[in-house]
Design a protein with these regions (language model features):
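Glycine-rich acetyl-CoA-binding "A-motif" of GNAT/NAT acetyltransferases
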Residues: 41, 121-126, 184, 197
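A short, internal acetyl-CoA/4′-phosphopantetheine-binding micro-motif in the GNAT/acyltransferase core
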Residues: 1, 23, 141-151, 178-179
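Helix-loop element at the rim of GNAT/NAT acetyltransferase active sites that forms part
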Residues: 10, 15, 75-90, 107
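A conserved beta-strand-loop-helix scaffold within acyl/acetyltransferase catalytic domains
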Residues: 85-99, 106-145
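A short beta-loop-alpha structural element at the N-terminal edge
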Residues: 60-83
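Conserved acetyl-CoA-binding loop-helix of GNAT-fold acetyltransferases
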Residues: 2-9, 143, 150-168, 187-191
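C-terminal appended segment following the main domain
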Residues: 160-208
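Acyl-donor-binding surface of acyltransferase catalytic domains
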Residues: 1-67, 177, 192, 200-205
């Protein structure tokens, strides 16, 4: 990893902030990156799961459409506090809600290969999925405010359905990413049969 070349590239192009991900297999690169001005904000875990074989539309799950943009955007704007690394960056924290809102709306308009919605007389949660050369990747999973038991039910329902949807798409495996400190989500994923695939460190560096 040539940090000097990366710095020069960012400076030449007027980049405000650079994001760096260091895989666990290259952990020795962390110290040079921090010395170069990167801030370590998050340790990320990637878990793997088997694709499902059921009907992904069961249990009040449906495909998301552009008509869901406002409601899913509202869910996204509150779902990821305080877990996402954008909340850990003091210069991005005030914009993090809007970032997740935009990310979700863009997913409905083609950034994701599909969006599934849990609909209980209105959206109660959503999950985005990406297809990558035979691998299914879960993007965002957001749940509307509700009592903990109700949120757990929505998360479990969405996880089951997204695995079934990936199975219908013929993927060979599924990867799901979350923060190492997000213990509630870690517990749900492991109880759903997910196993550890890899870890990585996420860092930010501001240039201006």
């Amino acid at each position: 990893m040539d940090l000097r070349a990366a710095d020069a590239w960012c400076e030449d192009r007027g980049v405000d902030v650079a994001f760096l991900r260091v895989p666990g297999t290259a952990i020795g690169a962390l110290t040079p990156a921090v010395r170069d001005g990167f801030d370590l904000l998050e340790i990320t875990t990637v878990l793997r799961a088997r694709p499902g074989a059921g009907d992904w539309e069961r249990g009040r799950i449906r495909a998301g459409t552009s008509a869901d943009a406002v409601e899913l955007g509202e869910i996204a704007a509150t779902s990821f506090r305080p877990w996402g690394r954008f909340y850990a960056d003091p210069r991005l924290r005030h914009r993090a809600d809007e970032l997740y809102r935009t990310w979700t709306v863009n997913s409905l308009h083609g950034y994701a290969d599909f969006v599934l919605v849990s609909d209980d007389d209105g959206p109660s949660g959503f999950v985005t999925g990406h297809l990558d050369d035979g691998v299914g990747r879960l993007g965002l999973l957001g749940v509307a405010p509700a009592p903990p038991w109700a949120r757990l039910g929505v998360v479990t329902r969405l996880l089951r359905s997204v695995l079934d949807r990936f199975g219908a798409d013929g993927v060979s495996r599924v990867l799901l990413e979350t923060q190492s400190h997000n213990r509630p989500m870690q517990a749900v994923l492991t109880s759903s049969g997910c196993t550890l695939d890899s870890v990585s460190a996420c860092l930010h560096k501001w240039y201006r």
